[in-house]
A protein has these predicted regions:
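Conserved N-terminal subdomain of the carbohydrate kinase-like
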Residues: 24-27, 35, 50-132, 287-289
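Structural motif
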Residues: 3, 132-133, 179
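Gly/Ala-rich phosphate-binding loop of Rossmann-like dinucleotide-binding domains
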Residues: 49-50, 153, 251
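Conserved phosphate-binding/catalytic region of the ribokinase-like
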Residues: 4, 195-289
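Glycine-rich phosphate/adenosyl-contacting loop at the front of the ribokinase-like
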Residues: 1-60, 65-69, 76, 232, ...
Length: 289
């Protein structure tokens, strides 16, 4: 099995559940509050590990209680944390999440996630096996993201680039990644409303996720990989589950369409639990894929 490296954020999620979102200047009463581990990188690492991947996390946390919780959670989920650094000059990253109306909205405070450096990443990638898979997202500094893409391209490593949260990026970098996995909102921010032509321009590379409608990519023709309906409790982390699952499927040399179907299945299960990682499935429940 190929190694999976997740380079990215590891945070604590501070979650409020309410029946609606407040209007500007309004205070409302929430239904409940809880804290859980999160961050897109950490979520993707946990997703991949639970589904049977051999996963290493690369990132940074603060030297604080939150940082310790993040590390312990990764260890409990059998993720290698030897490349997660503890820094003293900034606190651990946090995400402030509102759950309402069967969806979520999130404000991210990067904290230690912005302490990830090109030097740290370069050391790790230089030691990676040539068939390793690298997952990255946009919750670490942009210069580090671009460095990772360039370095992986130089080393011939397989990359899954999940461009969330949205940042402006030169399109030349898309030619250097193996797989590019925006959701429908992100692809519209990058390319405008009519993005089907763009998908065709990146065959077997651009995979646009469409929530419960599944995902679409181009392979001689537009391929719609169906989603799976689920009883939604919390959509937080569904995209991260998808990307972690996609990496696992590819690490087992599944064909791309089958890998996306596997990832859709995992994402559909993830929304039935509370919290970004609460509903993430283990391999044994993925019996029909």
């Amino acid at each position: 099995m190929r190694d999976i490296y997740v380079i990215g954020s590891a945070s604590i999620d501070l979650v409020v559940k309410s029946d609606r979102r407040p209007l500007k200047g309004e205070t409302i009463l929430g239904e409940s509050f809880f804290m859980t581990t999160g961050g897109k990188g950490s979520n993707q690492a946990v997703s991949a590990s639970r589904l049977g991947g051999k996963v290493r996390m690369v990132g940074a946390v603060g030297a604080d209680d939150f940082g310790q919780q993040i590390i312990e959670n990764l260890k409990e989920n059998k993720v290698d944390v030897s490349n997660v650094e503890s820094v003293t000059h900034v606190s651990s990253g946090t995400a402030h999440i509102t759950l309402s109306e069967d969806d979520n909205s999130i404000i991210v405070v990067p904290g230690a996630n912005f302490a990830v450096t090109t030097h740290q990443v370069e050391q790790v990638l230089n030691e990676a096996a040539e068939d390793a898979i690298v997952i990255l997202q946009n919750e670490i500094p942009k210069d580090v993201i671009l460095f990772i893409i360039d370095k992986c391209d130089e080393l011939g490593l397989t990359t899954i680039y999940n461009p969330a949260p949205f940042i402006e990026i030169e399109l030349d970098y898309l030619n250097k990644v193996t797989y590019f996995t925006p959701n429908e909102t992100e692809v519209k921010e990058l390319f405008g409303e009519d993005y089907e032509a763009i998908i065709k321009a990146y065959p077997n590379k651009m995979i646009v996720t469409l929530g419960d409608k599944g995902a679409v990519f181009y392979n001689d023709q537009l391929v719609n990989v169906p989603g799976i309906k689920a009883d939604v409790v919390d959509t937080t982390g569904a995209g991260d589950t998808f990307n972690g699952a996609l990496a696992v499927a590819l690490s087992k040399n599944m064909a791309l369409e089958d890998a996306i179907l596997f990832a859709n299945k995992a994402a559909s299960i993830s929304v039935t639990g509370l919290g970004a990682q609460g509903g993430m499935p283990y391999r044994e429940v993925m019996t029909d894929v």
